[in-house]
Amino acid sequence: VTVEDHQSTPTHIELQPPVTIKSYVRRGEPFESTYTAVPERVVAMWQNSIETIIALGEGDRIVAGMGIPNRKYVRSEYREAYDKIPYKDMKYANLESVLMMKPDLLVGWRSTFTNKGLRTPAFWQARNANVYIAESSLGAQSALTMDMEYQYIRDLGRIFNRNMEAEKLIHDMEQSVA
């Protein structure tokens, strides 16, 4: 698997000041990632990550989207952007393939980042790639809250310098559940 021929090269955008985001590893221990620029080569796992990045207007930065069995499951307003993602599959690509994609950000759930999966955040940080793990993927379903989802969207908004878009998504979600 290679995405070297990925046609669109996203614009380089520096973050001033740099953005530091707290995320969590498998057992819920926090770790921090600092972003000095908006990520340009994103590997996104699972539908929520892919759709949120697209909703923020940053779908052209996704070089691989994994975890969606068929495009029909993608919200209709996001399908055009989803179709442009160079590598799409229900299953994770193997580690070697992901390394060849040269990501600078990987977004997924805690189950993604294990020694048996796509390795730990420390593995990726040693290769100049940040990792963002959704807090909602850490615990039991009964512990999930909308605030966790809103924080997830806010964090991605900060990472991609799309704070206004993130707040609009959150506002729309709040209106739909009110």
Predicted ranges, named:
Residues 73-74, 114-118, 142:
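Extracytoplasmic/secreted cell-surface and envelope-processing proteins
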Residues 13, 35-37, 57, 99-100, ...:
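Extracellular/periplasmic catalytic domains that process cell-envelope and extracellular macromolecules
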Residues 120-178:
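Extracytoplasmic substrate-binding proteins
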Residues 40, 47, 100-105, 115-126, ...:
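Active-site-adjacent structural elements in enzyme catalytic domains
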Residues 11-13, 77-82, 123-125:
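Short, conserved catalytic or adaptor-binding loops enriched in Gly and charged residues
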Residues 1-51, 163-178:
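Bacterial Sec-exported substrate-binding components of ABC uptake systems
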Residues 41-101, 105, 109-111:
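A short, structured surface patch at a secondary-structure boundary
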